[in-house]
Amino acid sequence: MSHNSFGHLFRVTTWGESHGPALGAVVDGCPPGLKFTLEDLQVWLDKRKPGQSRFVTQRREDDLVKVLSGVMPQDDGSMITTGTPISLMIENTDQRSKDYGEIAQQYRPGHADYTYDLKYGIRDYRGGGRSSARETAARVAAGGIARLVLPGVTIRGALVQIGTHKIDRANWDWSEVDNNPFFAPDPKIVPVWEDYLDQIRKQGSSVGAVVEVVAEGVPAGLGAPIYAKLDQDITALLMSINAVKGVEIGNGFGAAEITGEENADQMRMGNDGQPIFLSNHAGGILGGISTGEPIVARFAIKPTSSILTERQSIDSQGRNVDIRTKGRHDPCVGIRAVPVGEAMVACALADHYLRDRGQTGRLK
């Protein structure tokens, strides 16, 4: 199975399976001389790791990242990138492959089981292999490296919808995101989501969600017209996350409901002699090129396919079966997708940052 790499100058390859001994990433193209500590990477993995609340999978993984290459250790305990490939590894320590024995020959409705088997003639039924959300741990580690490439850029994500329950944007407070198990920026939605997900869990079911990622401090001029648009690459990386079914930038599909006067971001010259935008409906990107305004992306995540509810399906022999999935699964995988979305946006921006620096010499 190919297509495990993405990026041009900042290039990432992820490897490993949900129930293998380990998984990880190789980051190629990171500039030399960037100083960081292991904690600078671990903080992002700690946001994504399972078992932190009753609303996510109870699989227990410490998700401790190891840096195997591409750095020089320093006397103060930090590391400096050398410019060679950075290899990152995260060990799997809490697999229960026996939970999947009953579905070894059965296809879970809504899952990649059928299409993987159809295309390759083999699939890793133990947790889904590469189609598992577990694969995203490697992306988050790579995203930690990508952030090192982006001076002055802040990338933050939040959960804005679970099922039909949306946040009130008037209550948006970034300081609240790390104070609840949902990464919710609206503290008033937290008890609503708690009650709702408790019901979903008791039913043995799952539900979808929407994540919003905002990147601030992105320099104007990243991206290129037509086939190298910044929003094109951000969208592609967000769509590559397992379970993502839709992505929008700025107003996104909402732009189809308003007029040109309402949608256009008008401009004026600021007191400092620099142009300013009076709104940001475009989500920080025009013509595939960043404007300097915050980049805003949202993505929709489908409900987890592995649920306890009995459903109709077929097996690998073409027989009709009724299937119920055992094991430990996220009732709402969108919760842990927040740091994954941040990582994907970071990787896209790092790649375009280096491409712009190489092509125009504007950025240092």
UniProtKB/Swiss-Prot annotation:
Cofactor dependency: FMNH2
UniProt EC number: 4.2.3.5
GO BP terms: amino acid biosynthetic process; aromatic amino acid family biosynthetic process; chorismate biosynthetic process
One Gene Ontology term, aspect cellular component: cytosol
Binding-site positions, FMN: 130-132, 242-243, 287, 302-306, 328
InterPro entries in UniProt: Chorismate_synth (IPR000453), Chorismate_synth_AroC_sf (IPR035904), Chorismate_synthase_CS (IPR020541)
PROSITE patterns, alphabetized: CHORISMATE_SYNTHASE_1 (PS00787), CHORISMATE_SYNTHASE_3 (PS00789)
Catalytic activity: 5-O-(1-carboxyvinyl)-3-phosphoshikimate = chorismate + phosphate
Binding sites annotated in the UniProt record for NADP(+): 48, 54
Uppermost EC category: lyase
This protein's UniProt keywords: Amino-acid biosynthesis, Aromatic amino acid biosynthesis, FAD, Flavoprotein, FMN, Lyase, NADP
Source organism, top-level taxon: Bacteria
Cofactor binding remark: Reduced FMN (FMNH(2)).
Pathway assigned to this chain's UniProt record: Metabolic intermediate biosynthesis; chorismate biosynthesis; chorismate from D-erythrose 4-phosphate and phosphoenolpyruvate: step 7/7
A matching Pfam family: Chorismate_synt
CDD domains (alphabetical): Chorismate_synthase
Recorded GO MF terms: chorismate synthase activity; FMN binding
Assembly notes: Homotetramer.
Physiological role: This reaction introduces a second double bond into the aromatic ring system.
The family this protein is said to belong to: Belongs to the chorismate synthase family.
Protein known as: Chorismate synthase
Native source species: Allorhizobium ampelinum (strain ATCC BAA-846 / DSM 112012 / S4) (Agrobacterium vitis (strain S4))
